[in-house]
Amino acid sequence: GQEVNGSTWALAMMNMFLHGFDNAVIRWGDTLRNPKLKVDDKLMKFDTVVANPPFSLDKWGAEEAISDSYNRFWRGIPPKSKGDWAFISHMLEVADDNEGRVGVIIPHGVLFRGGSEGRIRQYILENEHLLEAVIGLPANLFYGTGIPAAIAIFRKGRTSQNVLFIDASREFENGKNQNKLRPQDIEHVVSVYQKFVDSKFAPGVVEEKYAFVATPDDIRGNDFNLNIPRYVDTYEEEAEIDISAVQKEIEQLEAELAEVQVKMKEYLKQLGY
C-alpha cells in the first residue's frame, strides 16, 4: 500500500508487524502525485484494491494529472477541489485487468455531482460497466467526519452490466462518539451482495427499502445519477395522528396549567404580592 501521512504510515507498518505480516510493503508518499508501487517503472497490478481516501480532497494535483506519465486519468481530470474520482481512477488503473476488484469509501456527492465528475462516472457506467455495487452506510461511522458515506465496488472482467444498490444506513448501533456496524448489519450487506454476485437476483427490488438491482436502462434513465434514493425507496410513511387523542391531551395539559396558575396566585398572595 501507500500512505501520504507519515504518522498513519508508521501506524500501518507497526500494525502489519504486530499481526505477523513482516513482509508487508507500505510506501510513504503521495499516491496521486508520486505512486511508488512500481515494477520496471510501470504501476504494479493487484487482485484487490481497497482505500478510504480523504473525502473531496482539495489541491490533489489536477495540474500534474494532465501530464501523468502513467496515463491514469485518461477518462478525464476531476475538479482540482475534489479528488474523489482521482483516487478511484488510480485504483482502477492498478487493479488487475482480468479480475481486479476495487472497494473504496466515498462521500455521497461522488454518486451524483456533475461536471467532469459526471462525465467520468458516465463513461465508466456506459462504456466499461465496471461498477458492481453501491452500499450506503450509516452516518457518523468514521472518525473525523459525521457525514454519511458509501462504499463503491468495481470489478474488472464482470459479465453482468447491472448494479446493486444497498441502503444500509439505518442498520447500526448508536455509539457515544461514533456509530458502529453490528455483526448482523455486516452479515446482511454481505449476504445480499454475495447473492447478487452469484446472479440470484433479477433486476428490480430485491428487498423492500434495502436493496435494488438496476439495469443500464435504469441508470441511463436517471442521467447516470447514482444517488441511492433514486433506486432504493427510502420513504418512510409518517404515523397517523389520532386527532381526538391529541385534543384530549391538550385539554388535560390546559387543565393542569390552570391548576398550577391558581396555586401560584395563592402563593403570591401569601407572600404579599
Over which residues does each language-model region extend?
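Conserved SAM-binding loop
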Residues: 1
